Amino acid sequence: MMVKLICAIVDIAGAAFPIDIDTNELVGDFKKVIKAENSRTIACDANDLRLFLAKTDGRWLTEFEVQNGVADISVFEELDVVGAPLNMIGLSEETVSSVAITKELVKAKKTPLHVLVVPSEPVQLQRKLWLVTGTVVNALGSKGIRRHLHLMASLHIGFYDPTRRVDNKNVAFWYEAKNLCFHVLFKSSTCFFYVSPF
């Protein structure tokens, strides 16, 4: 029996997506489909994905709740048996279609979400990440600016953005002519401002 499962990648805003799959398929097959549908967003191999049933206290999470952040995935059941058919682990056609979708639910973004996806790489699971992006004009001629930006990266307080991969590589810094561009994710608790002495 084919079902449409709504999935969301944890901690990537706007990363909810539908997957059409037969409920007789296995968890391992489901991981491959998720990876194939999100090859630019998910950097790790399909077998390194962790999947969780997006249900708590008998109720599906909503897209609105997931967009506001999932604080603790440990309260959700992990779908960690690769050989388990989806219809035996809470993703049967009956359980998935148990909520009638109405205009009100759609407008409030309270439609049910079925599966939480946690990639193992390249971003460690965090509650909230801030994106810091920008350009340093004429960085090749500015003394010390490259050193400060690369030092910030080497302190391991920033993370690569899995949505920004070039030629299958993580990219946080790159040059466009003489301008140094940066695109880094930070834990909100470690963000800081730097005022250049130059």
From Swiss-Prot:
Motif interval(s): HVLVXXP motif: 114-119
Main location: secreted
InterPro entries for this protein: Crinkler_N (IPR045379)
Chain intervals for the UniProt region annotation (DWL domain): 56-113
Top-level taxonomic group: Eukaryota
Pfam families in alphabetical order: Crinkler (PF20147)
Keyword Secreted: yes
A GO cellular component entry from the record: extracellular region
Signal peptide region: 1-15
Region (LQLFLAK domain): 16-55
Compartment(s): Secreted; Host cell
Keywords on record: Secreted, Signal, Virulence
Family from the record: Belongs to the Crinkler effector family.
Note on domains (UniProt): The CRN proteins have modular architectures that include a signal peptide, a conserved N-terminus, and highly diverse C-terminal domains. The conserved CRN N-terminus harbors a distinct LXLFLAK motif, which is followed by the conserved DWL domain. A highly conserved HVLVXXP motif marks the end of the CRN N-terminal domains and forms a junction where diverse C-terminal effector domains are fused. The conserved CRN N-terminus mediates the translocation into the plant host cells.
Purpose: Secreted effector that elicits necrosis in host plants, a characteristic of plant innate immunity.
Protein name: Crinkler effector protein BLC01
Organism for this UniProt entry: Bremia lactucae (Lettuce downy mildew)
Gene this protein is translated from: BLC01
